Amino acid sequence: MIKPDPAGCTLTLRVHPGARRNAITGTHDGALKLSLTTPPTDGRANEALIAFLAELLKLPRARITLIQGQTSRTKIVRIIGLSTLEVESLVIPRATTLVRHAVLRMSRIHQ
């Protein structure tokens, strides 16, 4: 889910576009599940994903790069300048209690 990277870390995501609200909704096969209101048309959901993560992580969009999964629901993003622990500390407060435990469990596996 959250793995160290020489530039910071990577985050594996399972994205559900066209949802009622933008939210962290759970985990799925080792990925953090996100719902986005934007439909998956012309890359708009990918842009919305970067914007959502930038707001969540309090980073400029330029420091978040989609490195895998441009046309897939399973995506990997590189987050430049934040460690796995820093990302975890920013993501977990926005998740439900069950999701928090899953995120903690998954991130501990990859450290």
Residue ranges and their predicted role:
Residues M1-A51, K58-R61, T65-Q70, K75-Q111:
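Contiguous, often N-terminal, cationic amphipathic patches that form binding interfaces
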